Amino acid sequence: FSVDYVNNKYASNIYGALQVDRKVVEVNADVKINEGMENFTIAHELGHIVLHVPKMDKNKMTECDFDSISKDNVVEKEADIFAACLLMPESNVKEAFYQIRNSRLLLKDNFIFRLIGRGSKRKRALNFASKIIKQGNFKVSKYAMINRLIGLGLIKGLRYQKNNVNSRV
């Protein structure tokens, strides 16, 4: 498989797609994403190649729309988990985390925090994720790191975060 950057093909909410018949991962060049999101997009599509392409009907291998294959998005979640584990190995994340903190981070919605300018749980999580990314030299988005920290049980009190390109944080 190779990686191609394509214009004028996908909607702005599609970062990447897999062209199975051509053995190409396509990245939507029309969407301005940072390096971390680009890395995650490519790793996500690689997850589909490893986890899902071997199970596909060989006679129907064209553009792969995994969203339509799975109504409950299990396939997409599996590709996300694959990408997270590939780009942010558990041992590396924990090492970076424990160099900054000695215990799990419990985020509470606290009126006092908002008064003194420390912001919402989401904002505090984004700031903390930025520190972990820098400490561990990870090349991922803040949202990807937050979700990995949640998945590893290192952040409590926050649900998985959906990345939104249009909200520049």
Question: Where do the language-model regions lie?
Answer:
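Active-site hotspot residues in diverse enzymes, especially metal/ion-binding acidic/histidine motifs
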Residues: 1-169
